[in-house]
Swiss-Prot record:
One of its GO terms (molecular function) is aspartate carbamoyltransferase activity. InterPro entries: Asp/Orn_carbamoyltranf_P-bd, Asp/Orn_carbamoylTrfase, Asp/Orn_carbamoylTrfase_sf, Asp_carbamoyltransf, Asp_carbamoyltransf_Asp/Orn-bd. Carbamoyl phosphate binds at residues 54-55, 105, 134, 137, 267-268. It comes from Enterobacter sp. (strain 638). It catalyses: carbamoyl phosphate + L-aspartate = N-carbamoyl-L-aspartate + phosphate + H(+). Its EC number is 2.1.3.2. Gene3D superfamilies: Aspartate/ornithine carbamoyltransferase. This is Aspartate carbamoyltransferase catalytic subunit.
Length: 310
């Protein structure tokens, strides 16, 4: 029996290691062997209460390439919720009577979890709820790491930039902590350091981690360099100018890197990765974004199919 059938996917913590491996294995099979009719006759709602480019287009492309019909909206201001003041609960209650699954993004933390209470058993897939969770980003990150490194264990992973507010690094650390032998290097200004609850979680699992002031300190040791954008609005102007210069990756910084090392980024990048990095064999952020199709296809296929034969 497929353990993800009709399951809500709200947080990466909703998935066990075995379920993560099932999603990644399914993603690899779908990448190697497209299934254009796998979700034929299924109707999926794409409900984006908050603006999105990559996530919405990636999800909707995933739906279409599996043969599903797609309904929904990309701007809630033109819906009854936006124009007439309808509650999220009522909106989800109605939409769930039309479709087989609901993909939703919402600016309010906890909105996706709330939606599960009103969906009548129709699975909710969280495409991002405020600064809280973005589980499908984590799935495509894991898929890319496994694809480039051949494993998800015994890896050295550096995370750089805004580690305090960046939901992608929190979820990725939690997911990778389910696999043995990984070591983390956290590179961030003090004001944007990894939250204590993540560090405590790693300590409880006996996972080694360390904090560093610059990328150069760890370049020769890591398999994955996960860059994030330092958000200007989080720092005072003088501190931002200093931090911005300190956490920029250039091609010249990669000279001592391992040959297998890949640079990842959840995108959009601003100027934290110089464009000269794009031409190096280490740059993998555009392929990473492309892998979102297969990770999301896998999740949709598993949630909607009792038995998945690929």
């Amino acid at each position: 029996m497929n353990p993800l059938y009709q399951k809500h996917i709200i947080s990466i913590n909703d998935l066990s290691r075995e379920e993560l491996e099932l999603v990644l294995d399914t993603a690899a099979k779908l990448k190697a062997n497209p299934q254009p009719e796998l979700l034929k006759h299924k109707v999926i709602a794409s409900c984006f209460f908050e603006a999105s480019t990559r996530t919405r287009l990636s999800f909707e492309t995933s739906m279409h390439r599996l043969g599903a019909s797609v309904v929904g909206f990309s701007d809630s201001s033109n819906t009854s919720l936006g124009k007439k003041g309808e509650t999220l609960a009522d909106t989800i209650s109605v939409i769930s009577t039309y479709v087989d699954a609901i993909v939703m993004r919402h600016p309010q933390e906890g909105a996706a979890r709330l939606a599960t209470e009103f969906s009548g058993g129709i699975p909710i897939l969280n495409a991002g709820d405020g600064a809280n969770q973005h589980p499908t980003q984590t799935l495509l990150d894991l898929f890319t790491i496994q694809e480039t490194q051949g494993q998800l264990e015994n890896l050295n992973i550096a995370m750089v930039g805004d580690l305090k507010y960046g939901r992608t690094v929190h979820s990725l650390a939690q997911a990778l902590a389910k696999f043995n032998g990984n070591r983390f290097y956290f590179i961030a200004p003090t004001a944007l350091a990894m939250p204590q609850y993540i560090l405590d979680m790693l300590d409880e699992k006996g996972i080694t981690w360390s904090q560093h002031a610059s990328i150069e300190e760890v370049m020769g040791e890591v398999d994955i360099l996960y860059m994030t954008r330092v958000q200007k609005e989080r720092l005072d102007p003088s501190e931002y100018a200093n931090v911005k210069a300190q956490f920029v990756l250039r091609a010249s910084d990669l000279e001592g890197a391992r040959t297998n090392m890949k640079v990842l980024h959840p995108l959009p990048r601003i100027d934290e990765i110089a464009t000269d990095v794009d031409k190096t064999p280490h740059a993998w952020y555009f392929q990473q974004a492309g892998n979102g199709i297969f990770a999301r296809q896998a999740l949709l296929a598993l949630v909607l199919n009792r038995e998945l034969a690929l």
